[in-house]
Amino acid sequence: MKISEQWLRQWVNPNNSSEQLADQLTMAGLEIDDRFAVARAFSGVVVGEVISVEQHPDADKLRVTQVNIGAVEPLQIVCGAPNVTVGMKVPVATVGAVLPSDDGTGFKIKNGNLRGVDSNGMLCGASEIDLTDNIDGLLELPTDAPIGTDIREYLGLDNQILDISITPNRGDCFSVRGIAREISVINDLPLQMPNIPDNNQVIHNEAMPAVTVSAVEACPRYFLQSISNIDRTIDTPKWMQDALVQSGLRSHNFLVDVTNYVLMELGQPLHAFDADTIVGDIVVRLAQPEETITLLNEQTISLTGDELVIADDKGALALAGIMGGQRSSVTDSTTNIVLESAFFNPLAIAARARRFGLHTDASQRFERGVDFELPALALARAVDLITSVTGSQAGQIVAMENSDHLPARAPITLPITKVRDVIGIEIEPVVMVRILTQLGFKVEQQADSLICTPPSYRFDMSIKEDLIEEIARIYGYDNIPSILPHLQVSMDYDDTADLTHEMKLALVDNGYMEAISFSFSDAKLEALLDDKALGEVLALANPISSDLAVMRRTLLSSLLPCVQYNLNRQQSRVRFFETGLSFVGHSVSDLVQTPSIAIVAVGDVWDEQAYQNRALDFYDLKHDIEQLLPAKIDNARIRYERSQLAFLHPGQSAKLYIDDQYVGWLGQLHPNTAKQLDLTTTWVAQLSLAPLLTLAREQHAITTPSKFPQVRRDIAILVDSDISLQTLESTIRKASGTLLTDLWLFDVYQGEKVPAGQRSLAFALIWQDKTQTLSDDAVKTATDKVVQALTVEHSAQLRDS
């Protein structure tokens, strides 16, 4: 919004410069986007009076003038302007004056000779001094303009224009009054309101149309007043034209200019109807479906039924709060009008203007909220301006009000200590009361709080933090010192990141590279990686792209596309891992976000080399997974079970448990799934991070190694092939007690001399006591106990050789 500094200072005039004023507004939250003078720089131009005009002896279109600029002798100036006359006062550029030019260097006035006649200066039109005017010729100044006065001073051309960025919540600042109110509070100065006479002293007008408001929620306050016998020969006063032009508005005709002037001055949009075009009575209602109206911009629109319109018996006259209609528009011949001033609910105006591609000053203000107590004052101001300038007569006011539907202004309780807690410094309650009172709040001070009722023009005040912001910005952000809060905080060390980093390093040491991707996935890929254990696929309401439209249920959804990308670029050996969240659930309400680590591997065990290589297998994957476990973990705590996940190979996959707690899964991607993704044999795994971190945090007591010798005993047994190695090892450990310090499988045999459906397994048992050297009898007893347990529990047969 552009606004004139001179206009602002008519309302409040602080003792500071233009730059200081702009800085004050910026620091108060009203950012100054630009600041510039009304006219570009020039010098040497004064007010002069033409005292004689004679025809040039050698040029039909030139005149020789004598001009009084307050010097001892008048200046002789040759002029070609058609409107030069004796007695007129004009801007005079004296010799040495520098006028503005498009190239920025300036145009210097020198003594000249035009067709044999000396010319000592130049009489100026508006364009020569960087102004706009619709008159072809000299800029005629008022007759009371003081001769010899610098024209910049007389016309106020050093007046600064402030281009202010108004934030959406500050609709109350879309006017001179609103900005001046802020300046008055910042500088603790009174606001100088213009004198607005009582608007009730009017003549009675029998022709005034009746008004009905059927949409009271959308329009709870509506004023209409007639003005008749308007003299249209009177032009808009220059001071009003200047104010509008400097605010970025074009001068149209006097009646339209008045409504625009009041809009900029007070912030209330008004609309004038040509009274002679109104048929019957006025009704404020919602539009009828498919009702049409031709607007002032000659655009004909079809309404849908939720737009608010001002209508007469013939149809819609205006799109309320947005733009008037052409049928009732004010023209240069209009002499009788009815003037509208109303409060329209922001919800009734919002989005309607954009629907029809309209953006008007009125809609911009009504959408953000206009003071609902302002319509009567603005109407009185406009009526006074029109009647005082044109000598017209104002008619009666028709007022339709429904206070039940006006915006409520609920009191807000502000604890005094809360201000200190948020801002960080003590502000005296009396200062808070002054600031809030000057901002228009009704303030009731209590022992430990302030009860504040927002003014009618503040639609952005609802919670105590809003009040604290108002206090802080008026008190001055520059006056609030940067003091660090004194807090006693217990900073507990969180080792999650460090432990996770150690797991990542273990995978990197085994040839894996880390991938970082979105938590979103392709719905088609999720369908391939489907299993009832993973719940439902949760779709995003606003996906960033079609291939990232759902939440991933496993990290494979992110890793497999990475594998595809690399295989398509002749990378035959691929290793990736990723840490992140997987999202499992049947709906948003039961969604579980699990921090996980996943790996994927394709290709040979090693990079291409001169020595024999081989394809990756399940045990290589198992080895890589176990690198994520602490080295000190007892293998007896680890258990594997066959996995039932549909997207894994049923014979090459497993579930991992630690201390009977489910940790994750690993195995070969199901061949059918791999085929649909154009992948070769692919090994995958995913583990939950939480149990892995718990394991890593375990504290283990340091024990002294036994100084007594170890004893090894080997046993070979025949067992059914469907009995897992893990089950047999568990049985051995339970039967052996504390003397068994280590155990491993060193031979597997199936074939000749081994019955069908069985296999021969050979185990190494390491026995050791911490207190004594074990005797042969003690070792034999312990070994026999293990063999007996295997025989009883698994029908194992001890092999002699």
Curated annotation (Swiss-Prot):
Residues at which Mg(2+) binds: D460, D466, E469, E470
Residues covered by the FDX-ACB domain: 706-799
Protein origin, superkingdom: Bacteria
Cofactor binding annotation: Binds 2 magnesium ions per tetramer.
Reactions the enzyme catalyzes: tRNA(Phe) + L-phenylalanine + ATP = L-phenylalanyl-tRNA(Phe) + AMP + diphosphate + H(+)
SMART domains: B3_4, B5, FDX-ACB
Matches recorded under InterPro entries: aa-tRNA-synth_II/BPL/LPL, B3/B4_tRNA-bd, DNA-bd_dom_put_sf, Fdx_antiC-bd, Fdx_antiC-bd_sf, NA-bd_OB-fold, Phe-tRNA-ligase_IIc_bsu, Phe-tRNA-ligase_IIc_bsu_bact
Ranges where the B5 domain occurs: 407-482
Recorded GO CC terms: phenylalanine-tRNA ligase complex
One GO molecular-function entry: ATP binding
Entry keyword set: Aminoacyl-tRNA synthetase, ATP-binding, Cytoplasm, Ligase, Magnesium, Metal-binding, Nucleotide-binding, Protein biosynthesis, RNA-binding, tRNA-binding
Family annotation (CDD domains): PheRS_beta_core, tRNA_bind_bactPheRS
Domain tRNA-binding as annotated: residue spans: 39-152
PROSITE patterns in the cross-refs: B5 (PS51483), FDX_ACB (PS51447), TRBD (PS50886)
Pfam families: B3_4, B5, FDX-ACB, tRNA_bind, tRNA_synthFbeta
Cofactor(s) required, per the database record: Mg(2+)
EC numbers: 6.1.1.20
Compartments, as annotated in UniProt: Cytoplasm
Gene Ontology biological-process entries: phenylalanyl-tRNA aminoacylation
Quaternary state and interactors: Tetramer of two alpha and two beta subunits.
Similarity-based family: Belongs to the phenylalanyl-tRNA synthetase beta subunit family. Type 1 subfamily.
Protein name as it appears in the record: Phenylalanine--tRNA ligase beta subunit
Species the sequence originates in: Psychrobacter arcticus (strain DSM 17307 / VKM B-2377 / 273-4)
